[in-house]
Amino acid sequence: MRCVSRSAQDTARWGTVVGRLLEEGSVVVLQGALAAGKTCFVKGLALGLGIQEEITSPTFTLLAVYHGRLTLYHMDVYRLASLEDFFDIGAQECVYGTGVCVIEWGERVASELPEYTVTISLRVLADGNREITVA
């Protein structure tokens, strides 16, 4: 699936659509440059999971946990120096757990993710809009 988002609200709405479709054990990798809208997408995804809490970027905390229809494990692995760091934050329990695991910059730990991982790419277009691709 490929779509174009014309605003932060559009990006969040697309996230909500995806969040409503996710099931227990889903793993989602978000790819995109800095400020491409990854966390904005996760805010919508969380709404689709019935989560009402404020969603913030886990860039410095590395992992945030939210509770809704399913538990959301929101990770940002951009700052991790090694796969060992990925294991140290308890990522394996999140990836192979019963909630939904969303990993920003997840391509950095792709070797540790299941085959059924969904990849969502956000790309900033020349006009400032975002192209969102789900694979």
UniProtKB/Swiss-Prot annotation:
Q: Which residues participate in ATP binding? A: A35, A36, G37, K38, T39, C40
A GO molecular function held by the record: ATP binding
Record has DNA-binding as a keyword? no
Gene Ontology cellular-component terms for this entry are:
cytoplasm
Q: Where in the cell is it found?
A: Cytoplasm
Q: Which GO terms describe its biological process?
A: tRNA threonylcarbamoyladenosine modification
Q: Which UniProt keywords apply?
A: ATP-binding, Cytoplasm, Magnesium, Metal-binding, Nucleotide-binding, tRNA processing
Highest taxon of the source?
A: Bacteria
Q: Which family does it belong to?
A: Belongs to the TsaE family.
Please give the function described in this protein's UniProt entry: Required for the formation of a threonylcarbamoyl group on adenosine at position 37 (t(6)A37) in tRNAs that read codons beginning with adenine. Is involved in the transfer of the threonylcarbamoyl moiety of threonylcarbamoyl-AMP (TC-AMP) to the N6 group of A37, together with TsaD and TsaB. TsaE seems to play an indirect role in the t(6)A biosynthesis pathway, possibly in regulating the core enzymatic function of TsaD.
Q: What is this protein called?
A: tRNA threonylcarbamoyladenosine biosynthesis protein TsaE
> Which species is this record about?
Treponema pallidum (strain Nichols)
| Lineage, opening ranks | Bacteria, Pseudomonadati, Spirochaetota, Spirochaetia, Spirochaetales
Which gene holds the coding sequence for this protein?
A: tsaE
